[in-house]
Amino acid sequence: MSRFLICSFALVLLYPAGIDMYLVGLPRIAADLNASEAQLHIAFSVYLAGMAAAMLFAGKVADRSGRKPVAIPGAALFIIASVFCSLAETSALFLAGRFLQGLGAGCCYVVAFAILRDTLDDRRRAKVLSLLNGITCIIPVLAPVLGHLIMLNFPWQSLFWTMAIMGVAVLMLSLFILKETRPAAPAASDKPRENSESLLNRFFLSRVVITTLSVSVILTFVNTSPVLLMEIMGFERGEYATIMALTAGVSMTVSFSTPFALGIFKPRTLMITSQVLFLAAGITLAVSPSHAVSLFGITLICAGFSVGFGVAMSQALGPFSLRAGVASSTLGIAQVCGSSLWIWLAAVVGIGAWNMLIGILIACSIVSLLLIMFVAPGRPVAAHEEIHHHA
């Protein structure tokens, strides 16, 4: 079992590493490529677009051909794209490399969640996804620090060579450690069960909405945090970095505590707690009389996301044994596209950073609480009872 957990964690971590590690080198990258930092900030959106594009096909291929045939090319593409970025001499080539990086990371991301669905029951999967969420929270803190240390002695290209090395590690794990987990092709008697795993299942759609809104909350916070903390609240750059590190610490602590909480409370209780924390955060930020109270509201955001997201993802994947890859892809596409659409629309309409965050917090909490309370899970899927995997 440990081999599946290690491989899944490694596959997922390419995604945040690809986002956060290069940011520290952005000024030098812009200077070398004769582009402005503003022009290269689009590299974040291009990377996410690559991930979304990969998710359009990766899930279906993973369900038809297996998890390894998607993970191995995905890791290989991430390696090639990282090297391509390091060799880019124009901003256009750099952005093309970032898109390819996103494609590779997206393939690996989809496979990771499908593997966890294949190998873990509902309760254990919720615990593992909560732990995975905590580990993922470490990357936005450690990756820029690692990038800074690398750039003390090496050029910005070394950041992408480091990502390539990470990709090589994931590729080796996928080739030699990971075993295929895709359920065997269903017999004729299992066809009704396969056909019943519809993506239009009300329970699944409700969890897609909940997780998409939750990701929109956390990405809105990350996207607006420089404006909120430095421009509006007046913190210096060093203080901003400290605050973000502390919020990551809150996220990690809550994420690592959630598996223990699942041994005491029902998953539904933790999901309700998550949304109540979001609502409390929105109200706190809306009426905050001081910076201290606002910072408390921000910690509620991090705690709310960490306590509920892994549980919601586990519930979303629960109904799917034979179509776990497609379900994972659907979740990923909805989360990436939904959160990006919200941030883009809010910017186009001219909603300020503060109101953007408050608005998504309150909307997420109200909609999600209604869905949690009124959309009950269907008949438990028996698919995890005995799954015969390909060797």
From Swiss-Prot:
What species was this sequence derived from?
Answer: Escherichia coli O6:H1 (strain CFT073 / ATCC 700928 / UPEC)
* Similarity-based family: Belongs to the major facilitator superfamily. DHA1 family. MdtL (TC 2.A.1.2.22) subfamily.
Location (main, coarse) = membrane
Gene3D superfamilies the UniProt entry points to: Multidrug resistance protein D
Q: Which gene encodes it?
A: mdtL
Q: Which biological process terms from the Gene Ontology are attached to this UniProt entry?
A: response to antibiotic
> Any ranges marked Cytoplasmic in the topology annotation, and which?
1-3, 63-68, 114-133, 179-202, 266-268, 314-330, 377-391
HAMAP family referenced in this protein's UniProt entry, alphabetically: MFS_MdtL
Where, subcellularly, is it found?
Cell inner membrane
Question: Care to name a GO molecular-function term for this sequence?
Answer: transmembrane transporter activity
Q: What's a single GO CC term here? A: plasma membrane
Matching entries from Pfam families are given as: MFS_1 (PF07690)
Role summary: Confers resistance to chloramphenicol.
Among PROSITE patterns, the record links this protein to:
MFS
Q: What is this protein called?
A: Multidrug resistance protein MdtL
Give the bilayer topology. Answer: Multi-pass membrane protein
Q: Which residues cross the membrane?
A: 4-24, 42-62, 69-89, 93-113, 134-154, 158-178, 203-222, 245-265, 269-289, 293-313, 331-351, 356-376
